[in-house]
């Protein structure tokens, strides 16, 4: 019998082992769909971004006009822009759900896969931040000014670091051109890191909702999960197209329809919705360096989760107390997101401080404590 080219060809063999004959646990739920959705998001963003870059001018005097020109005069330019801007929002929705799944089902115990995933998240956040600056509207300009200024909190080298990042003494043309270069480059770094992420994942195989080994009972990825992923894609495309076609500016900031003006500060500078939780943590600490450290810790804390796992069970499926704490953490993040969008005044300041404190307490103290308690209750 002739060898199957799918299994013998050096390149096709890799695709086959990743997408066709990949042994997969039979009981993984829809929460396992988000990995493939993130891959599709990345491809969509790269394609729409490439087409937008063909019409964009990375110059502080022309950037705003070139984006306007793309929307008005380029065939389907408005659609490209709306898909790219709202695709970023969907990308973050998917990655947050993907991370939530990982926390709930103990996927972080695959340490290499988890750590590369956190690095992917950090790269994605950097990409989204530099991308938000490119339209050169008011919020783009002032967002860039505020966030890059945080580097000045680094002792001794802070000021030099900021001026080096800016390419001058303020956010100006050199800043815009280098941000465009970075925004073009980073998605390809994300794509290569994704391959590393998948390499580590396929080394161990997927986790499953029960958190038990499933080697004795696996099924091929295709057709079972390829069909399931296509359904997930259809369900994801629906909100994306609804958003891009009917409410394209729902998640944007009205300030960004005004060209950047260094002489006029917007009344309330805030990032896109997907960074608001971290922004709220940054603002809740009245000290600049402390705020920057808390901001970094809010995401870097994910690296610690494998070390904080004290339960004898992998997933939270049969741990109701841990489930309660998990959903409290989710609610807490939603509160932080809401507070981050509000002005810095009385009720919001204290709510933000309490929510920030609760965020770190939940992850660092409550999860390990509750897990240990559950072990005792279950006589482990």
Swiss-Prot record:
Q: How is the cofactor bound?
A: Binds 2 heme b groups non-covalently.
Residues at which a ubiquinone binds = 202
Choose one Gene Ontology CC annotation of this protein and give it.
respiratory chain complex III
Places the protein is found: Mitochondrion inner membrane
Keywords from the named record = Electron transport, Heme, Iron, Membrane, Metal-binding, Mitochondrion, Mitochondrion inner membrane, Respiratory chain, Transmembrane, Transmembrane helix, Transport, Ubiquinone
Transmembrane regions: 34-54, 78-99, 114-134, 179-199, 227-247, 289-309, 321-341, 348-368
- InterPro entries xrefs: Cyt_b/b6_C, Cyt_b/b6_C_sf, Cyt_b/b6_N, Cytb/b6-like_sf, Cytochrome_b, Cytochrome_b_C_euk/bac, Cytochrome_b_N_euk/bac, Di-haem_cyt_TM
Q: Which cofactor does it need?
A: heme b
Topology in membrane:
Multi-pass membrane protein
| GO BP annotations listed | mitochondrial electron transport, ubiquinol to cytochrome c
Which residues of the sequence carry a binding annotation for heme b b566?
Answer: 98, 197
UniProt-annotated binding residues for heme b b562: 84, 183
What PROSITE patterns does the record point to?
Answer: CYTB_CTER, CYTB_NTER
What CDD domains does the entry give?
cytochrome_b_C (cd00290), Cytochrome_b_N (cd00284)
Q: Does the keyword Transmembrane apply?
A: yes
Return the SUPFAM superfamilies for the record.
Answer: a domain/subunit of cytochrome bc1 complex (Ubiquinol-cytochrome c reductase), Transmembrane di-heme cytochromes
Q: Single GO molecular-function term? A: ubiquinol-cytochrome-c reductase activity
Partners and quaternary state?
A: The cytochrome bc1 complex contains 11 subunits: 3 respiratory subunits (MT-CYB, CYC1 and UQCRFS1), 2 core proteins (UQCRC1 and UQCRC2) and 6 low-molecular weight proteins (UQCRH/QCR6, UQCRB/QCR7, UQCRQ/QCR8, UQCR10/QCR9, UQCR11/QCR10 and a cleavage product of UQCRFS1). This cytochrome bc1 complex then forms a dimer.
What family does this belong to?
Belongs to the cytochrome b family.
Instruction: Describe the function of this protein.
Output: Component of the ubiquinol-cytochrome c reductase complex (complex III or cytochrome b-c1 complex) that is part of the mitochondrial respiratory chain. The b-c1 complex mediates electron transfer from ubiquinol to cytochrome c. Contributes to the generation of a proton gradient across the mitochondrial membrane that is then used for ATP synthesis.
Q: In the UniProt entry for this protein, what further remark is given in the free-text comments?
A: Heme 1 (or BL or b562) is low-potential and absorbs at about 562 nm, and heme 2 (or BH or b566) is high-potential and absorbs at about 566 nm.
Q: What PANTHER family has UniProt attached to this entry?
A: CYTOCHROME B (PTHR19271:SF16)
Q: What is this protein called?
A: Cytochrome b
């Amino acid at each position: 019998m002739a060898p199957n080219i799918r299994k013998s060809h050096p390149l096709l063999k890799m695709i086959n082992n990743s997408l066709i004959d990949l042994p997969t646990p039979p009981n993984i739920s829809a929460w396992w769909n988000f990995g493939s959705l993130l891959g599709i998001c990345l491809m969509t963003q790269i394609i729409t971004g490439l087409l937008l870059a063909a019409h964009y001018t990375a110059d502080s005097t022309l950037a705003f006009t070139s984006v306007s020109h793309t929307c008005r005069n380029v065939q389907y330019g408005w659609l490209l822009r709306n898909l790219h801007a709202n695709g970023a929002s969907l990308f973050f929705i998917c990655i947050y759900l993907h991370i939530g799944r990982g926390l709930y089902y103990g996927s972080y115990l695959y340490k290499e896969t988890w750590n590369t995933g956190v690095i992917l998240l950090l790269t994605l956040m950097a990409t989204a931040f530099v991308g938000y600056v490119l339209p050169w509207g008011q919020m783009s300009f002032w967002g860039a000014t505020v966030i890059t200024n945080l580097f000045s909190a680094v002792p001794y080298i802070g000021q030099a670091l900021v001026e080096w990042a800016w390419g001058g003494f303020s956010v100006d043309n050199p800043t815009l051109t280098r941000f465009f270069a970075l925004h073009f480059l980073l998605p390809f770094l994300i794509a290569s890191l994704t391959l590393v992420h998948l390499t580590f994942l396929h080394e161990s195989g997927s986790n499953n909702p029960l958190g038990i080994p499933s080697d004795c009972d696996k099924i091929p990825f295709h057709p079972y999960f390829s069909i399931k992923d296509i359904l997930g894609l259809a369900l994801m495309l629906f909100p994306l197209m609804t958003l891009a076609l009917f409410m394209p500016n729902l998640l944007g900031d009205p300030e960004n329809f005004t060209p950047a003006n260094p002489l006029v500060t917007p009344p309330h500078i805030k990032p896109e919705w997907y960074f608001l939780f971290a922004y709220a943590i940054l603002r809740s600490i009245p000290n600049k360096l402390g705020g920057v450290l808390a901001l970094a810790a809010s995401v870097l804390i994910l690296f610690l989760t494998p070390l904080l796992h004290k339960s004898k069970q992998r997933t939270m499926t049969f741990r109701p107390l841990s489930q309660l704490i998990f959903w409290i953490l989710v609610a807490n993040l939603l509160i932080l997101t809401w507070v981050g969008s509000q002005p810095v005044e009385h009720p919001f300041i204290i709510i933000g401080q309490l929510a920030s404190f609760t965020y770190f307490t939940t992850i660092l103290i409550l999860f390990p404590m509750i897990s240990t308690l559950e072990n005792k209750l279950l006589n482990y």
